[in-house]
Amino acid sequence: ELFHHGPEDVVISLIKFIGTMVILLNIHSGLALCAAASLPFMLVFAYVYNGKLKRAFKRNRDRIADINAQLEDSLSGVRVVKSFGNEDAEMGKFQSGNNAFLESKKSAYKIMGIYNSGMGVFTTLVTIVVVVAGAVFLTNKTLEVADLVTFMLYINNFTDPIKRLVSFTE
């Protein structure tokens, strides 16, 4: 799935982003630069939290591997465990491994929530910056209302490829 849709998504997103940026620059270059000003912050945020997500998901895989290894050992030695009456000890080991997996899963979901919320904040911030800068440009009479409306309609075409590229790296 990744090899089929991945390169396609990257190419489409890059073309859409570059094309939209060219259109926005033609509508009003100052407003386009204001919209693009948040990109470095968004990319740094995405890079940092993408790394945290990868580490959290690796911890999840490690914890589930620990549980599977312990289960395999327990099942292969079930007669020995029963003969020595160690069922409670084995259940305790399983519960301990299960709790470690649960905690790593909670941590991963927390990081994922912060990451997705943060990306939402940055994309909303682009819209807010455009509205505020547009108001300033309207006040200075360097921007027409029709251009601001057109610009606002293109903003989603500007932020959607960024969100798609960032989610691709997840």
Residue map of PLM features:
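An intracellular "coupling" helix at the cytosolic face of ABC transporter transmembrane type-1 domains
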Residues: 1-3, 7, 52-69, 73, ...
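Phosphate-coordinating loops and pocket residues in cytosolic domains that bind phosphorylated ligands
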Residues: 4, 12, 38, 96, ...
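Transmembrane helix-loop junctions in multipass membrane proteins, especially transporters and channels
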Residues: 9, 21-29, 51-59, 85, ...
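Residue-level recognition of pore/gate-forming positions within transmembrane alpha-helices
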Residues: 9, 13, 39-43, 120
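Hydrophobic, membrane-inserted alpha-helices
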Residues: 15-20, 131
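Generic hydrophobic alpha-helical segments
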Residues: 21, 71, 78, 134-135
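Helix-loop-helix
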Residues: 23-37, 46, 111-170
